[in-house]
A protein has these predicted regions:
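Hydrophobic alpha-helical membrane-embedded segments
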Residues: 22, 53-72, 140-165, 237-250
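Transmembrane alpha-helical segments and their cytosolic interface motifs
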Residues: 94-111, 193-217
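Divalent-cation
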Residues: 1-74, 78-81
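Polar-ligand-bearing catalytic/cofactor-coordination segments
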Residues: 2-11, 15-17, 31, 88, ...
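Hydrophobic alpha-helical segments characteristic of transmembrane helices
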Residues: 79, 83-128, 132, 136-157
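Juxtamembrane "helix exit" motif at the C-terminal ends of alpha-helical transmembrane segments
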Residues: 75-79, 106-129, 207-231, 235-238, ...
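Multi-pass alpha-helical transmembrane bundle typical of ion/small-solute transporters
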Residues: 41, 49, 59-62, 66-85, ...
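Short, charged, low-complexity patches
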Residues: 48-59, 233, 237, 275, ...
Length: 313
């Protein structure tokens, strides 16, 4: 079926969904009710035409998604703060906080997933007494993958993170339900797949895979130059990875299916089977940005008048 064009992420006790310039965050509040917050956004390419060019648009989309993700996480967390904490948060400079959060996320990501594997690979190459660029690139890629798998597995032991992974599964199931031509009702969603080709976890796989290919061919004797090149190519690799995930996520070809598989396997680490009440929250988020009934009718599928989920609180 035609791609719905919706995507999202899990937040604290909820789900954020985005379709074009519409964003909705649905959160299960402590009192059990579902709160849905909506907002409009402007895509990077609408702000500047250059940001819509291939590869460049991937970098812009990544940064934009990071900012939106932090904002929606803050929104969901606000329901679980006590009154005094909420007042303190409201008094803070939102712009400065956002800049700090994004900067910290980028620095942490570079440190853990670029610098650590780089130095680890250099150390192993010395132990092996090898100068092979191919071996170095493969070792570095394996270390990156190992660190990522270890990281997501370790934090999944935390109760809140485990529940977030379950909401992540609910988000995926909603998209799978719609794109498989089924009505967005809890029973259908629960029976749907939690695999989603356009997921950010699959994006990470493409980043790892493409970086290995790049660094097999980019060979420099200087250790500092090798490190500088890796840092400089982060945006380029991210941009190319974005193009790949857009293609595999919207293509039904055999090749796209094969290339998607490793990302879907890794996805199993960051998505867990949700409960029915989590699915209800995800449905509320979808309905905040997307008319799934109209989408199904466009595909020639008859839609009943059955309610899709709980009433918005």
């Amino acid at each position: 079926m035609k791609s719905s064009g919706i995507g999202g992420q899990a937040v604290l006790e909820g789900v954020m969904m985005r379709h074009k310039n519409d964003i909705a965050v649905a959160v299960r509040k402590p009192d059990g009710n579902i709160e849905v917050g909506r907002q409009k956004t402007v895509s990077p390419k609408e702000k500047c035409k250059v940001l819509g060019w291939p590869v460049i648009r991937g970098v812009a989309a990544f940064i934009s998604s990071l900012i939106i993700g932090i904002k929606t996480l803050s929104f969901s967390a606000s329901f679980y703060m006590d009154e005094e904490e909420a007042k303190k948060e409201n008094k803070k400079n939102e712009g400065a906080m956002m800049f700090g959060a994004v900067a910290f996320s980028l620095v942490l990501g570079v440190g853990i997933f670029i610098l650590l594997p780089f130095w680890g690979a250099e150390g192993l190459m010395k132990l092996l007494g090898s100068e092979s660029a191919v071996l170095r690139a493969v070792i570095e890629g394996v270390l990156k993958l190992g660190i990522f798998i270890g990281y997501v597995s370790l934090i999944s032991l935390m109760k809140d993170i485990k529940r977030t992974y379950m909401y992540h599964g609910a988000e995926h199931k909603c998209i799978s339900c719609i794109e498989s031509g089924r009505e967005l009702v809890p029973d259908n969603v629960m029976d749907s797949s939690k695999e989603h080709r356009r997921c950010g976890t699959s994006f990470i796989f493409f980043v790892l895979f493409i970086s290995i290919i790049f660094f097999i061919f980019l060979r420099f004797d200087s250790l500092l130059i090798r490190l500088a090149v890796r840092l400089a190519l982060v945006p380029v690799i991210a941009g190319i990875s974005f193009e790949f995930i857009q293609w595999t996520g919207n293509s039904n070809t055999v090749i796209a299916g094969i290339l998607s598989k490793p990302g879907l396997w890794i996805q199993a680490l960051t998505t867990k089977e949700p409960t029915r009440d989590m699915v209800e929250v995800a449905i509320a988020a979808v309905e905040g940005v997307f008319d799934w009934r109209a989408y199904l009718r466009e595909q020639g599928i008859e839609v009943s008048g059955q309610a899709a989920g709980p009433e918005e609180q």
